[in-house]
Amino acid sequence: MVQRWLYSTNAKDIAVLYFMLAIFSGMAGTAMSLIIRLELAAPGSQYLHGNSQLFNVLVVGHAVLMIFFLVMPALIGGFGNQKRYESNNNNNQVMENKEYNLKLNYDKLGPYLAGLIEGDGTITVQNSSSMKKSKYRPLIVVVFKLEDLELANYLCNLTKCGKVYKKINRNYVLWTIHDLKGVYTLLNIINGYMRTPKYEAFVRGAEFMNNYINSTTITHNKLKNMDNIKIKPLDTSDIGSNAWLAGMTDADGNFSINLMNGKNRSSRAMPYYCLELRQNYQKNSNNNNINFSYFYIMSAIATYFNVNLYSRERNLNLLVSTNNTYKTYYSYKVMVANTYKNIKVMEYFNKYSLLSSKHLDFLDWSKLVILINNEGQSMKTNGSWELGMNLRKDYNKTRTTFTWSHLKNTYLENK
């Protein structure tokens, strides 16, 4: 019972202890106040027999108890985190983490979340050699388009980790996991399913958690339900063996429809799948800039779909003061445009569904792929060209129709 309360890391348990201290201190302070009032109310009858020192002790003790052991623990201890949270997030809307009775399918959730985090997520871990006085815990943040708020809430509810922040006047939302339990849970879920150089950040996060758990006897007792994370190697299994590519595509992939009106050849509607990632993952370590290449994972994806891997170079104008400063970005790109190879893309994403709003684009995209595969390119009524034109009216960036029925009973949940 003693260990239950003294070693608890639950915020509600800690708040209850603060309230208990405040109540006990309030009772003691009230008793002192009563003695002081009796002493002052009867000048001719000295209850303390003229002991001025004892009277002064009671006055000072009453003030200390009521201010530092009643008011501060009750208000700051019991409500401090809530007040600070509200004041620091005036520009954010925090979405409720509703409690759903969902069971996780780790074999599918792990790869999907790994792909999602390796695409649009970050795992931030302070360097152990940092000279900063303030040490902070690992932080996991996943960025979603504003249209994918439903997915962010779904994953937050499913894993019971973190909170979803909707930024005011921004076109994105953030799923942020900062508490120890949440970070520990998510690192365990994606352990063994990472495929890109971001694995390096995962390892640092897992090592931080292991070192923190074993740092002191008190910490170890507090976190006795948390075992050390047994760090697994990079996942080198076949791309089609799990949902990793679905998570990565929800982050950085897209399904496009091009309408090609050529002069020397007939007009065509061209559906294609594209995934583009930067070429290198950079990490500053002891003033040494270490590069890790994305070539191997992108080559594996290209091989899976039997297409070529392309290298792309782009110059971005940084607009520094009045001078045009350019920064060159290098990326690898996988593009599947062949009709028969698009069928394999369909087979994969029918098995491991996308969960973002891109799922709706994929369904429309699939209609065009199936029509072209069955009937070929056609400018006729109800042909591929007409279908492509109609689909593009509510598609990708122009989409205004969103449904989320595909988030009910997903393959990420046990069945």
From Swiss-Prot:
The UniProt record lists the keyword Transferase: no
Question: Where does this polypeptide localize?
Answer: Mitochondrion; Membrane
Q: How is it modified after translation?
A: The mature protein may arise from proteolytic cleavage of an in-frame translation of some COX1 exons plus the intron containing the aI3 open reading frame.
Keyword DNA repair listed:
no
Q: What class of enzyme is it?
A: hydrolase
State a GO cellular component annotated for this protein: mitochondrion
Q: Locate the transmembrane regions by residue number.
A: 16-36, 57-77
Q: What else is known?
A: Strain Capensis / YB4237 has two stop codons in position 276 and 407, which disrupt the gene coding for this protein. Consequently, the corresponding intron containing its coding sequence is not mobile.
* Protein's name according to its UniProt entry: Intron-encoded DNA endonuclease aI3
Native organism is: Saccharomyces cerevisiae (strain ATCC 204508 / S288c)
Q: Which gene encodes it?
A: AI3
